[in-house]
Amino acid sequence: PSLTITTIERDEKRYLEALKNIKKLKLEDRITLIFNDALDVSLSEKYDLIFIDAAKAQSIKFFEKFEKNLNPSGTIITDNLKFHGLVDKDEEEIESRNLRALVRKIKEYISFLKGNINYKTDFYELGDGISVSKRIEEK
């Protein structure tokens, strides 16, 4: 198959674990692993699928930064949109101020996805909640 993967990891421990797994499975020719913060990485390649599983407070930044790398009929998937069920709670129910701020950011991202006319986004209760945003091709 011609499938290739580019993945970005900023946590050194996770990066080294991924590197070990890629070598163990002999997938070095198919998986490119980048050790960096994704917001500091510039990619020129185009992708059919982009998967965002990163700092939840920055999901809009990740989406806007990497959508230029998405093929015209591509899809962006975002993980952990329920954030351990906290997104479904009223703000007053969340004791930590930092968690409230993070939940607010996730809710802003969900609104961003719902309002983005360039994508058809569906939300699923799978795991901790995911969104699947399919780019609407221009005619």
Predicted feature residues:
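S-adenosylmethionine/decaboxylated-SAM
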Residues: 1-139
